[in-house]
Amino acid sequence: MASNGKGPIAPNQFPPPVDPQKEFIKRGLDAEDELIEVGVAIVGGATAGLATANRLLQLLADDPETLEKLGEVPVAIIEKAKSCGAHALSGAVIRPESLHELFPDLSREDWRKERFAFGEVKKEAVYMLPSATAKLKIPTPPNFKNHGNEIISVAALARYQQRLAEEAGAYVLTETAGMQLIVQDGAVVGVRSGDKGRGKENEELRNFEPGSDMKARYTVLAEGCWGHLTGAAIKEFNLGEGKEPQVWELGVKEVWKVPKPLDRLIHTIGPWPLKLSAKYGQIGGTWLYPMKDETTGDDLVSIGFVVDLEYADATTSAHDLLQQFKLHPLVKGILEGGERVAWGAKALPAGGYWSMPKLSMPGAVIVGDAAGMVDTVALKGVHHCVTSGRLAAEAIYNSLKTGAPLSAYEDAIEKSSVGKEMYQVRNTRQPFQKGFIRGAPMVNIAIMTKGKVPGGRLAWHTNDSTPLFIGDTADGYPKPDGKYIFDKLSSVYISGNVTRDDAPNHIRVQKSVPREIAEGWKWMCPAGVYEIPDDAPATGPVEVIVNYTNCVQCGAITAKGGRLTPPEGGDGPLYTIT
């Protein structure tokens, strides 16, 4: 393992220059004539946040007396992207029950007509890939079974949820970043939006618009994975006490228009193109999902690669591993002759049950991915986002009606399918921190026993505490040809990413770091944000160039030694079918 002469080098030895409580917690509200007052402020306009809004408005529609308690603007949704769902990305296959519970009048045919659903899973296959050319079909593991589930786009689902919420009376503020959580007298009392029109040095430009305080009776943190305000709230209210640290994975996805339909859902579980040796610390897998657009008749395929951010080889790159995976005959037979029509990248929480923070605090609750509600064994989280949003809305409504504490939301989660499913896989990912070969037997035991293992609770260590070395994973990455294999910058381009060249830098990292850390950031980032100068020394500290305008806000840097903060509202990708 490479070192600086003083032992192994891990990203957490070079923490980002940020103090979440000092910077992202605002103490007290502005004067009454300088703020916006709403009933419920929801930070994040994607699956979980919009589920909260829609369910709450359903309940209030039949209860004008309670609705009146929330004032002229009963529900406001703050979304940093240009539109709801524009920063949302997932595979995605959803267990349909959660959407049926939220929208009981909608059939699955209705979902497809609204173009956020693309067909029921009727056939599926799981393969092991021993090498770049070989494949071995294996029985579908119980947790992987998807028969009867629905293939969807979370970006498109969010747009549909937004429309329903607005029709029901929600006030949706897009292009608005939630920059600070407002705390007064020990309770969350709202959110402050970010400034617009600042320059590179944070100076006010001609078009400068200051942020404003949004006072709220209740606040819902639905920021998704890595939740900026959620992270500050966890520290402020000690919501992580007695919990394991959160850990992450990074997924990179493409959508292809193909000449012939894929007739089944496919997962692969490696080891190729990852390295099997424990020293590389690589765990990951892939998906290929058929998507039939009933409106246009187009046959589409969602393809993605997910890698655990626990890895040790600094040259591990989820984007390049996806390009390498596409060279396998299994994949080429599906995609060849087609056209890539979309690309995106997003981190996802992988810590599971023991890493979920306390879900409520005075004045606020946390929902969905922001709370870590992802079952990485079943590769599922969207249905948990929907259910948690629904239960949060019901807890807020009951609090309004009866004065019940928001902690009732936590009890509801524990008793729901979310709590039960997350608990059953509570110890199934931690063993992989010892490597695939050593960890797999314990993982299988944990799956078979529904989480029962010696000791009862397996611990995590943070992704950024794993020492990095400069390995040879990158030696296998193919060269881009612009037709089938793509580089990072052309991929960022088709994501619709737009960030002002003179905007302030929203990424916090130490600029001078050992080569191992710099290489790790360079390869990790799917958008090519981190660059090492050509004349940088081969060993020792290097000065990292941060091309922050490339950023698609995937959040992976937070797992590997930096910190993503919200850019100016409206910046970032414009995902449509991811």
Name what the model sees in each region.
Residues 1-41, 55-74, 198, 491-515, ...:
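Extreme N-terminal leader/targeting segments of oxidoreductases
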Residues 44-46, 80, 154:
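Glycine-rich Rossmann-fold phosphate-binding loop(s) that bind the pyrophosphate
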Residues 49:
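N-terminal Rossmann-fold NAD(P) dinucleotide-binding loop
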Residues 55, 59, 71-131:
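N-terminal FAD cofactor-binding segment of flavoenzymes
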Residues 58, 67-71, 155, 164-333, ...:
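Predominantly flavin-linked oxidoreductase catalytic cores and closely associated redox partners
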Residues 71-72, 372-378, 390, 394-437, ...:
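Active-site-proximal substrate-binding core of FAD-dependent oxidoreductases
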Residues 345-376, 490-502, 512-524, 531:
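FAD-binding beta-loop-beta segment adjacent to the flavin cofactor pocket
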Residues 518-578:
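Iron-sulfur cluster-binding cysteine motifs and their immediate structural context
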